[in-house]
Amino acid sequence: MRIMGLDVGSKTVGVAISDPLGFTAQGLEIIPIHEEKGEFGLERLGELVKEYKVDKFVIGLPKNMNNTSGPRVEASQAYGQRIAELFGLPVDYQDERLTTVAAERMLVEQADISRSKRKKVIDKLAAQLILQNYLDRNF
């Protein structure tokens, strides 16, 4: 079963994919979006769904530290509903608290990547962490 992990932001969607057995997650790419213009990167997402024969989506939910939901949670759920209807695939959600922080820490401490380069990969790495956390908890 191939699962696609998504880190949905207001400007980009980080994309990760599981291996065919569902053991490991790998970051794929960052899709630019523009919420205000109604551009959600769905065409590119569709290309990736076909290329990787995706069976399911996992979307990170950016809950607050006190477990409450804010506007980004609602935006992520709306994105999930949109892609579920468009692609006819199930969508699960994964708590993503601190995944971007963890991704940034990994890039700084382990890879010593500059700030400008981090911006180019942070969402992809966050999507990978979201998906890997999901795989570790569910398979």
UniProtKB/Swiss-Prot annotation:
Keywords: Cytoplasm, Hydrolase, Nuclease, Ribosome biogenesis
Subcellular location(s) of the protein: Cytoplasm
Pfam families reported for this sequence: RuvX
EC number(s) reported in the record: 3.1.-.-
Coiled-coil intervals, chain numbering: none
Molecular-function GO term, any one: nuclease activity
Top EC group: hydrolase
GO cellular component, as recorded: cytosol
Cystine pairs: none
BP-aspect Gene Ontology terms: rRNA 5'-end processing
InterPro entries xrefs: RNaseH-like_sf (IPR012337), YqgF (IPR005227), YqgF/RNaseH-like_dom (IPR006641), YqgF/RNaseH-like_dom_sf (IPR037027)
Recorded family membership: Belongs to the YqgF nuclease family.
Task performed by this protein: Could be a nuclease involved in processing of the 5'-end of pre-16S rRNA.
Official protein name in the record: Putative pre-16S rRNA nuclease
Lineage: Bacteria, Bacillati, Bacillota, Bacilli, Lactobacillales
